């Protein structure tokens, strides 16, 4: 990582109230190398410039720490982790969390597993599979304190895919861009349908970059009905209470 990239990372983290140590910076620098090399072979990310990766992957991943919603959590699921975001940046700064990085694409999960091992992030567990299937698995259902997602899907889809994984009193932290009123209304109804209530809608700008972001927090307040999640592909094709235009 160049001095400019390091400065951007430090500035972005500082805006989030995080003070990065030399060990943190070393791991982020190694993650940058791993991502750049891996993406050239596996097409892991559309971002290739150091500035974009630092701000729009590393710093953006850390914005789920806003508001302290991860405080007190032990077991956290990153649903739709892709190349490991937000799981890997979170693992670097929060070694107290047991992070499970879930994606349906084997090559991405393999990359996350190799990278976590390379960075000595032993508290990251890779998991390959579909949320619709694993959300019905007794070993996974209602077994997490938090679920984090980053730019995965519309809120009604997220509610159905994520709430089944949460214990009672757990929280979904959905990292998204701007949310329109129709998506928010449908997301509110979908959350209630599957056992949740929206507790916070935190609109902010991405540190340094200035892009609009939203952190939606949903609490698991009731058991998810057994019929959810619906079978594979249905939540995306027929979102609850939502017709995307």
Curated annotation (Swiss-Prot):
List of residues binding S-adenosyl-L-methionine: 80, 85, 103-105, 131-132, 150
GO cellular component, one term: cytosol
Major place of residence: cytoplasm
Coiled coil (residue ranges): none
Pfam family, one: GidB
InterPro entries associated with the record: rRNA_ssu_MeTfrase_G, SAM-dependent_MTases_sf
Cellular compartments annotated: Cytoplasm
GO molecular function: rRNA (guanine-N7-)-methyltransferase activity
Alphabetized UniProt keyword annotations: Cytoplasm, Methyltransferase, rRNA processing, S-adenosyl-L-methionine, Transferase
Enzyme class (EC, first level): transferase
The EC number(s) this enzyme carries: 2.1.1.-
NCBIfam families recorded: rsmG_gidB
HAMAP family: 16SrRNA_methyltr_G
Family to which this protein belongs: Belongs to the methyltransferase superfamily. RNA methyltransferase RsmG family.
Biological role stated in the UniProt entry: Specifically methylates the N7 position of a guanine in 16S rRNA.
Name this protein carries in UniProt: Ribosomal RNA small subunit methyltransferase G
Source organism: Deinococcus geothermalis (strain DSM 11300 / CIP 105573 / AG-3a)
Lineage: Bacteria, Thermotogati, Deinococcota, Deinococci, Deinococcales
Gene that produces this protein: rsmG
């Amino acid at each position: 990582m160049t001095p400019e990239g390091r400065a951007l990372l430090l500035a972005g983290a500082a805006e989030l109230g995080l003070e990065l140590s030399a060990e943190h910076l070393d791991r982020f620098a190694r993650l940058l190398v791993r991502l750049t090399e891996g993406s050239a072979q596996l097409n892991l990310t559309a971002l290739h410039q150091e500035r974009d990766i630092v701000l729009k992957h590393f710093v953006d991943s850390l914005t789920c720490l806003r508001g302290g919603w991860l405080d007190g959590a032990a077991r956290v699921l990153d649903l739709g982790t892709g190349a490991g975001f937000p799981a890997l940046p979170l693992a670097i700064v929060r070694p107290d969390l047991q992070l499970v990085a879930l994606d349906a694409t084997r090559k991405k999960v393999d990359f996350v597993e190799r990278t976590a091992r390379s960075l000595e992030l032993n508290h990251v567990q890779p998991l390959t599979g579909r949320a619709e299937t694993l959300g019905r698995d007794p070993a996974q259902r209602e077994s997490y304190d938090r679920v984090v997602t980053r730019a995965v899907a519309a809120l009604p889809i997220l509610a159905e895919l994520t709430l089944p994984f949460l214990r009672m009193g757990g929280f979904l932290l959905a990292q998204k861009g701007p949310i329109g009123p129709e998506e928010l209304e449908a997301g509110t109804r979908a959350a209630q349908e599957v056992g949740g209530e929206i507790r916070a809608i935190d609109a902010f700008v991405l540190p340094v970059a200035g892009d609009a972001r939203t952190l939606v927090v949903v609490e698991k307040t009731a058991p998810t009905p057994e019929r959810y999640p619906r079978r594979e592909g249905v939540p995306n094709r027929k979102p609850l209470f939502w017709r995307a235009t």
